[in-house]
């Protein structure tokens, strides 16, 4: 994430008309690190403080600084929240256990994100105030959920109760990232992009488009998904259950604050 921004800005500066070329970089909500309630609201201007071991966030911070100090006249940096895309309901990776159930996100619908980029690229009269700015990218108030709530909604859409698929303490209780934005509406004012899509309908569309092997998950015998799918996933590298099983001191300290807190 560090090399490309530097390469792109250098390439723009080498053009005969660099001041007329816009350079947009994509950052992440991860740049501001762990935001536990009651500090779960955030804005551009908050300290950049990535979570422990989050090299992704660290690289995004370096990339953001590179673009800001590139010397270009037209640049913008978009700190994207979690992207609600077609495959989000199918994610089965131990990294999902890094999310804290009491954490929050203001999701960005993938169609909204695409519309924003399209509007910037195709509108040569985009509001001049947009350039030379850093923005939080989210789909607004309807898309603000706690992680527990959004997971519950997605599992319910498959016809199951989340509590039958995994236990609460299979997930970290700290050291993730996420916040609800106090300032994401400002980007919408400058470059309108939000569709106002209903979250529940969007979840239903994702589930309806999933393979049949996945949509049948809610009708499996109780404990089947939990013990034969979710538990083995959580025991893989980077999974919280593996940290606990192996009593990994660094992992347990980072994601739970100690073995007794798990």
Summary of predicted features, one role per range:
Residues 1-55:
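Conserved Rossmann-fold NAD(P)-dependent oxidoreductase catalytic core, especially the SDR/UDP-sugar
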Residues 61-87:
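Conserved beta-loop-beta element that borders a ligand/cofactor-binding pocket
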Residues 120-190, 196-202, 213-221, 225-262:
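Mid/C-terminal beta-alpha module of Rossmann-like enzyme folds, strongest
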Residues 31, 83-85, 142:
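Conserved sequence/active-site signature of Rossmann-fold short-chain dehydrogenase/reductase
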Residues 99-124, 133:
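Substrate-positioning beta->alpha
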Residues 56-60:
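Active-site YXXXK catalytic motif of short-chain dehydrogenase/reductase
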Residues 22-27, 76-82, 106, 136:
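Structural signature of the Rossmann-like NAD(P)-dependent dehydrogenase/reductase core
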Residues 85-97:
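C-terminal beta-strand-loop-alpha-helix "lid" module of Rossmann-like NAD(P)-dependent dehydrogenases
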